[in-house]
Amino acid sequence: MVEVELKFQIPEARRNALLKALDPKKSKIIQLKAKYYDTEQRLLSQHGVALRQRLEGTRWIQTLKAAGKSHLHRFEHNYDLGELEQAPQLDLSIYEHDAEAQQILKNALQNSQEPLKLQFETDIQRTFRVIQFQETDIEVSLDVGEVRTGTAQREMHEVEFELKSGSVQSLLAFSFEWVKKYQLWLDVRSKAEIGNLLAMTQKVSPAKSAKEFTLSKKDPANKNLRLLIAQQLQHLLPNIAAISAVVSEKEHIQQAQIALDHLNLTLSLFKDWNESVSDKWAMQIGAFKQQFDHLQHLEHMQTTLGAFLQNPNTASNLTKDILYAKEKLANLVRSTQNVHHYLELLMFSLDTEEQAQSHDLKWFAQNTLQNQYKQLQDSLTSAEITDFE
């Protein structure tokens, strides 16, 4: 089955208010104790796969999870192992009759003979209830607890919105209502990813790089644009999560900047490919990207002018300015306004209701190319040598 959910982090000052909104009297509370398994080389996590056994109340459930087509979608296979006095042994034979689960494990493990060993555990108290919104059932789960290894632990306090029935569009609209009320910020990192980092004594996963996109000849222009933006969000959001959590490295900031540049170009060049594209999106993304450019300019001055001048006051001021720019950027990427932008683009990229177009993809591609060439030629023609003096 495919699980559709969004996860958000909650500012400490808004946690009690969110718990009240969930209303514990109307909610269920369950203790979830999970054990996560992988090989010594982390072959499963390298392929975006998680394998766990979790005690849910009195029953043990073995779950296989894998990345899906977007940050909302995940493959999930659950198997009820029953009520047991002790934690059960890991059992891979339960996947023998599920072709998709078998393929996921085969792709990750290949021919490895490495045994699957316990890597980390989670101990979570979940307060949850199903809320109806626009004829859609959404399970809201507040998870509070910790992830731990034999030598380290980390607190967890997050909220998940899972689609139980209805439309993805309603799930996204519902999520944004909670984002506005409780200043939630989108976090595409899973508990498995956080646990693996803790087990490896690392703060953050490597920065996500862009993947090459190929237009699909069999699909219309409006669908191709949705697919392109979906892929660019796959590039952007993991890097944004690292910045939001204040654990990012230089590469995360650079890759987020590249992803925003790609999104800005896509929304500017191909806006006529889909009637649902808003003119404001490119402007919003462009303004957002300027904050990354500002940090880049400061860092460039530090490594060039600052290094050359060797002035202690200049060096100190540049260091302070860069630190301030990074703090401002971390606040900006998790701001309600920008989380709204992410959700708006996600909503657009996942919409499946395409309007019939009177022209095929080739016509749109040729038309866009001709228009861009004309703009470039007009710009070159109007340029005078004095413009560069």
Give a label for each model feature.
Residues 1-389:
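Function-determining surface determinants
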